[in-house]
């Protein structure tokens, strides 16, 4: 069934470009930029990927991102991801990038954006993959820093379709960023937000009611709140679910416990995505395949999940 799943046309709506940095490319960029790494070789780095929770993953993720320095680096990162998409028949992508991860290291905003945009344009022209780019704020940083990032983004407003919210969830509720999101919407941006991954269902309510998001990234803890489930079904609010990520970060102890198919059968508009595939052991097809292997996902369910991803695009 893997080949059939691979050939299924699909969109990816929850993907962090920095999270596609495979160990081989990380080492190549470190060499190109003459950066000393704390790992001796690719295999040592792969072993470091045995993290146990979101914070351990984020610590490794931000350390790895340090090799991204030049416009060419960001182009190469994005282009490598798009080639994976082509191989898996991902026909549309709406990736996140985290400018603060780079501007806080002294990399100019425009350098980051130029490399990513050039690769996305080439992906559309040469690979036929349509796209919309989402600027994501880091929630463990302050509201003031998010406002500053929005200031930096406004001269390039035509480069983005939406703003989002990611990073360490617990203790950083969506309400912390309500004013930034209000301002972003007034400037013409759509909004999305990570909520209900490690954080409680209340964070999903806040994302919907205070940030007024078009869709929820993750959202799996909605299953704990029947009233919230009813709203997601009634309003057909998409959830961009990332199964391999959820098990790797221990949101679920095992894939057999994942609720995505239960939510699908109840009428929630769930989609399948890879989140940070270099770190979580698989791109979109591998996520679909894991559901088939562990939960007995049928072809009919896979078709619905793929169609949901195409229907939930912000760029139609």
UniProtKB/Swiss-Prot annotation:
Q: Reaction catalysed by this chain?
A: adenine + H2O + H(+) = hypoxanthine + NH4(+)
Task: Return the annotated site residues (Important for catalytic activity).
Answer: 218
Identify the InterPro entries for this entry. A_deaminase_dom, ADE, Ado/ade_deaminase, Metal_Hydrolase
Active-site residues per Swiss-Prot or TrEMBL entry = 197
Tell me yes or no: is Zinc among this UniProt entry's keywords.
yes
Q: Would you kindly state one Gene Ontology biological process term found in this protein's UniProt entry?
A: adenine catabolic process
**UniProt superkingdom:** Bacteria
Record's family?
Answer: Belongs to the metallo-dependent hydrolases superfamily. Adenosine and AMP deaminases family. Adenine deaminase type 2 subfamily.
What is this protein for, i.e. what is its function?
Answer: Catalyzes the hydrolytic deamination of adenine to hypoxanthine. Plays an important role in the purine salvage pathway and in nitrogen catabolism.
Please identify the protein, giving its name as recorded. Adenine deaminase
Q: State the organism's lineage.
A: Bacteria, Pseudomonadati, Pseudomonadota, Gammaproteobacteria, Pseudomonadales
């Amino acid at each position: 069934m893997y080949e059939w799943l691979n050939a299924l046309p699909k969109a990816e709506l929850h993907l962090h470009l920095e999270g596609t940095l495979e160990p081989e490319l990380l080492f190549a960029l470190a060499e190109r930029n003459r950066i000393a790494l704390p790992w001796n070789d690719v295999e040592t780095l792969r072993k470091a990927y045995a993290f146990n929770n979101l914070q351990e993953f984020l610590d490794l993720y931000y350390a790895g991102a340090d090799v991204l320095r030049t416009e060419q680096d960001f182009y190469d990162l994005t282009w490598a991801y798009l080639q994976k998409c082509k191989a898996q028949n991902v026909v549309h992508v709406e990736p996140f990038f985290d400018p603060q991860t780079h501007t806080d290291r002294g990399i100019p905003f425009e350098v980051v954006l130029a490399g990513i945009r050039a690769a996305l344009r080439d992906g559309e022209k040469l690979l036929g993959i349509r796209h919309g780019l989402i600027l994501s704020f880091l929630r463990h940083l302050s509201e003031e820093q998010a406002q500053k990032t929005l200031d930096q983004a406004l001269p390039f407003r035509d480069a983005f379709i939406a703003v989002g919210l990611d990073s360490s969830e617990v203790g950083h509720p969506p309400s912390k960023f309500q004013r930034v999101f209000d301002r972003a919407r007034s400037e013409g941006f759509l909004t999305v937000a990570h909520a209900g991954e490690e954080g409680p269902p209340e964070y999903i309510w806040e994302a919907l009611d205070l940030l007024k998001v078009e869709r929820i990234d993750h959202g799996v803890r909605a299953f704990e709140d029947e009233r919230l489930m009813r709203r997601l079904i009634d309003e057909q609010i998409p959830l961009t679910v990332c199964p391999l990520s959820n098990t790797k970060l221990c949101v679920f102890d095992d894939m057999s416990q994942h609720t995505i198919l239960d939510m699908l059968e109840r009428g929630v508009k769930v989609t399948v995505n890879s989140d940070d595939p270099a770190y979580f052991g698989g791109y979109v097809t591998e996520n679909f395949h894991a559901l088939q292997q562990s939960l007995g996902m049928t072809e009919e369910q896979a078709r619905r999940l793929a169609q949901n991803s195409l229907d939930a695009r912000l760029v139609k």
